[in-house]
Amino acid sequence: MKLEVFVPRAAHGDKQGSDLEGAGGSDAPSPLSAAGDDSLGSDGDCAANSPAAGGGARDTQGDGEQSAGGGPGAEEAIPAAAAAAVVAEGAEAGAAGPGAGGAGSGEGARSKPYTRRPKPPYSYIALIAMAIRDSAGGRLTLAEINEYLMGKFPFFRGSYTGWRNSVRHNLSLNDCFVKVLRDPSRPWGKDNYWMLNPNSEYTFADGVFRRRRKRLSHRAPVPAPGLRPEEAPGLPAAPPPAPAAPASPRMRSPARQEERASPAGKFSSSFAIDSILRKPFRSRRLRDTAPGTTLQWGAAPCPPLPAFPALLPAAPCRALLPLCAYGAGEPARLGAREAEVPPTAPPLLLAPLPAAAPAKPLRGPAAGGAHLYCPLRLPAALQAASVRRPGPHLPYPVETLLA
């Protein structure tokens, strides 16, 4: 490896002094000359670059010749060797520096260990309630609550101060604490009092301070299948199977019996998916035509109707209303239903078709088939309104509204 050391050139004013010193001290041994050619070598392994004495660059023949001659080269080589030694010492110090620094920091960390005191085994709600209950007046400010906690528990005396925010948040976010204003004109002040809410005593039941009401763990007893809910006494959690009840005159539907046989945890209602899928699907038209689903005309006795005046004159086409709109059905079914009406049934509010206005099938606006229209006994006001032009309160004809 070739090591080259660069030193600054000597000033021109110091040149003569160095020459004189070199000339006068030529008899003194030089550290380079003492080493000899064997230490540095003559092949230029460690050549000292020094400025020339005559103001220009002068090549040297060898380190041994310069030291033996006692010229200025020997004097300038001494600072170069010293600079090389300083550089080597700095490198050694830099190599040993990180390890020494780490050891020093480790010693400092070991000398001051971090110890955190144990936290008390209570929630912040319990600690605040404890402080308020131990007070003389039953109310404390935020600063007084903090002082109480610091005086009673060592955990709150350490360097950790985040517990103060927890105390403040628990005071303002829980319903079990109530703020009592010291000055009503300053509700935003921090010196207000805090006390326990008398309506939230359930949170402090059994000596345990809870955030919410404790849920009831026991469940209501399930009534036996043969007993009604109001007749079932208090039974254990798993009641034994009761004997089958005698058949009652009012028979229960099979759907209701299946619901009772289903487990108690299963949702049983008419809107449940099981009960919806259990019922067979029937279209609306089939439900309307099924026997027993529609009320036949004259099936039930009706009170006698009051006598009506004579038949009104034939109404125009606007007063004709479709019988299908009132549940009369299509004309084909009307004759079959009239045959079923007993002779004692009261007459309908339908006027017989006069000869001047025979029944004619008209095509309704909604249905595509033909409907049977006949004049009804409408009040005089409604007939008058249907005869004249539609006013501001009746913008459309009657058959358009009722069709």
UniProtKB/Swiss-Prot annotation:
Q: Where is the composition biased (Gly residues)?
A: 96-107
Query: Tell me, what is one Gene Ontology molecular-function annotation carried by this entry?
Result: DNA-binding transcription factor activity, RNA polymerase II-specific
**This protein is called what?**
Forkhead box protein Q1
Q: Which organism is it from?
A: Homo sapiens (Human)
Q: In which tissues is it expressed?
A: Expressed predominantly in the stomach, trachea, bladder and salivary gland.
DNA-binding residues (ranges): 119-214
Pro residues bias (residue ranges): 236-246
Keyword Transcription set for record:
yes
User: Where does it reside?
Assistant: Nucleus
The record's principal subcellular location, in a coarse class, is nucleus
Q: Where is the composition biased (Low complexity)?
A: 32-48
Purpose of the protein: Plays a role in hair follicle differentiation.
Task: Look up the record and give one Gene Ontology term from the biological process aspect.
Answer: hair follicle morphogenesis
From the UniProt entry, list the residue stretches annotated as the region Disordered: 1-75, 94-116, 216-266
Q: What is the lineage of its organism?
A: Eukaryota, Metazoa, Chordata, Craniata, Vertebrata
Q: Which Pfam families match?
A: Forkhead (PF00250)
Record keywords: DNA-binding, Nucleus, Transcription, Transcription regulation
Cellular component terms, GO, for this chain's entry?
A: chromatin; nucleus
| The organism's place on the tree of life at top rank | Eukaryota
